[in-house]
């Protein structure tokens, strides 16, 4: 059982630390580059985070009530061994985020070197990779730096975590101040009209961009909506976890999104085009001392947050699958390797790759898992779990060979409507029927609905082994 000492303030502060990162900034800036006005972009981010807050709070409930982390909670619905499925799904996505953050760190090093007056980097792009030799070297150097940290153990980076988020807040505010001065105030900064307005270059196309963007916003934090019990298990009460999350996630995300939106809008005035990547923007500012220091600190901050957020979880998931063969270091090396093979720079070339391929594709996997966890806990079990049974190999959650057929079937069926659309968006296939592209646009919502409904039906249709589904003693649960 976890010690329960986190208050509303602790839960809210947790979200401040997680929200303030470069991908969050790029998320909002990418909407400006897609043609939205600042109001449309900020409202899209806010709405997406309000939506994902719902499964976040719901999945946080069992963490607070029973003190169990995500991998243990998943045993109730997927089975003792079947719980490896959602854990590995979450781990695979963390590997992707590791690659994206590694590219951000490598790009910061590239811009840092270019900002030095005696160094000029560039050159033709390498075949297959699509980036030049210097960019490749900076990416691999930052990747190798993280591998060294993994080898030494995650504790070697703890001291940096304490100031990573504060620095990024300062950097964001500094960029906002710079944009304010350069663009001539908030009036000109935020005056850039929506390209979807009547007579604009994208007149009549707003909804075709808004809905997939909204799905991408939900997908951005859908990973945390699964393993949020890892944090809410420390909350003193349901009130603390609910209110803390409600304060911390949508408000911080909206405010940080505004910084990204305002600065990106200002770059349209300053440079004649929207610059949504802060590392590229810092590089465009020139080689001043403050820019060099900012790029260096951004590199260190990205290193610390990437190890903590995107190595620990997948490494632990791999250890759970094969505890005798996988150590934390081996799990970290596998994560680092997979982070390269996704070619993260391809995803970040433009908002289409980042939002429409990566974030929506991620949401197609995470929505179904979240739905199964929620339906199992609230609908099937009425919030009552056999706490001891979650830790017994032959207990009530062993199902059939350690797997719950209802959960596995529901998860697989939920991928059918969105998989063709993802294959088309990722350019794995040439064409698909238009209805699959449409369903992919709503991937998280479609997957959540299909998995939730199918799981509820299958749990009634498929005969379940006799289980002792008795509530745990009151002393084991947190204050309601």
What are these regions (language model features)?
Residues 20-24, 47-55, 89-101, 165-182, ...:
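Selective recognition of specific alpha-helical transmembrane segments in multi-pass small-molecule
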Residues 2, 369-454:
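C-terminal membrane-solvent junction of multi-pass transporters and transport-like membrane proteins
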Residues 30-35, 60-62, 77, 85, ...:
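Membrane-water interface regions at transmembrane-helix termini and the short interhelical loops
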Residues 29-60, 82, 87, 97, ...:
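Extracellular loop-to-transmembrane helix junctions
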Residues 102, 106-115, 167-197, 220, ...:
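Hydrophobic alpha-helical segments and their helix-loop junctions in multi-pass secondary transporters
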Residues 87, 114-151, 166-175, 213-228, ...:
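Transmembrane alpha-helical segments of multi-pass small-molecule transport proteins
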Residues 89, 100, 137-181, 191-192, ...:
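Membrane-interface loop-to-helix entry segments
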Residues 1-39, 53, 172-175, 182-186, ...:
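Membrane-interface "cap" regions at the ends of multi-pass membrane proteins
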């Amino acid at each position: 059982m976890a010690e329960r000492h986190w208050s509303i303030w602790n839960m809210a502060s947790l979200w401040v630390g997680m929200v303030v990162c470069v991908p969050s900034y790029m998320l909002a800036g990418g909407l400006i580059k897609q043609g939205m006005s600042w109001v449309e972009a900020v409202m899209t981010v806010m709405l997406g985070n309000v939506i994902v807050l719902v499964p976040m709070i719901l999945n946080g409930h069992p963490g607070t009530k029973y003190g169990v982390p995500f991998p243990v909670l998943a045993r109730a619905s997927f089975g003792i061994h079947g719980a490896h499925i959602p854990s590995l799904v979450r781990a695979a996505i963390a590997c992707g985020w590791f690659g994206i953050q590694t590219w951000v760190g490598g790009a910061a090093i590239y811009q840092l070197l270019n900002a030095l007056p005696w160094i000029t980097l560039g050159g033709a792009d390498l075949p297959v990779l699509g980036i030049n030799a210097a960019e490749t070297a900076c990416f691999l150097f930052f990747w190798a730096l993280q591998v060294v940290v993994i080898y030494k153990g995650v504790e070697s980076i703890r001291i940096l975590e304490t100031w990573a988020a504060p620095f990024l807040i300062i950097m964001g505010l500094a960029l906002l101040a710079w944009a304010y001065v350069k663009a001539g105030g908030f009036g000109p900064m935020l005056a850039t009209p929506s390209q979807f307005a009547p007579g604009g270059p994208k007149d009549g196309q707003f909804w075709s961009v808004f809905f997939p963007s909204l799905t991408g916003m939900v997908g951005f934090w859908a990973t945390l909506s699964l393993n949020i019990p890892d944090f809410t298990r420390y909350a003193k009460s349901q009130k603390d976890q609910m209110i803390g999350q409600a304060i911390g996630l949508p408000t911080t995300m909206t405010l940080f999104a505004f910084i990204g939106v305002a600065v990106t809008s200002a770059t349209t005035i300053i440079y004649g085009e929207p610059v949504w990547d802060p590392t590229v923007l810092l590089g465009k500012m020139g080689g001043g001392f403050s820019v060099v220091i900012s790029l260096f600190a951004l590199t260190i901050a990205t290193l610390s947050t990437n190890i903590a957020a995107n190595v620990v979880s997948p490494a632990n998931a791999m250890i759970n699958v094969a505890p005798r063969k996988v150590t934390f270091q081996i799990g970290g090396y596998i994560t680092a390797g997979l982070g390269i093979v996704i070619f993260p720079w391809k995803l970040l070339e433009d908002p289409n790759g980042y939002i429409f391929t990566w974030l929506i594709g991620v949401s197609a996997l995470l929505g179904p898992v979240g739905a199964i966890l929620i339906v199992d806990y609230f609908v099937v079990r009425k919030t009552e779990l056999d706490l001891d049974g979650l830790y017994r190999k032959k207990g009530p959650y062993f199902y059939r060979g350690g797997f719950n057929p209802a959960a596995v079937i529901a998860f697989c069926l939920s991928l059918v409507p969105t998989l063709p659309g993802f294959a088309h968006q990722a350019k794995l296939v040439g064409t698909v029927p238009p209805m699959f592209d449409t369903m992919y646009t709503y991937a998280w919502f479609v997957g959540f609905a299909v998995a939730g409904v199918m799981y509820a039906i299958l749990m009634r249709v498929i005969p379940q082994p006799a289980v002792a589904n008795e509530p745990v003693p009151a002393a084991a649960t947190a204050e309601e």
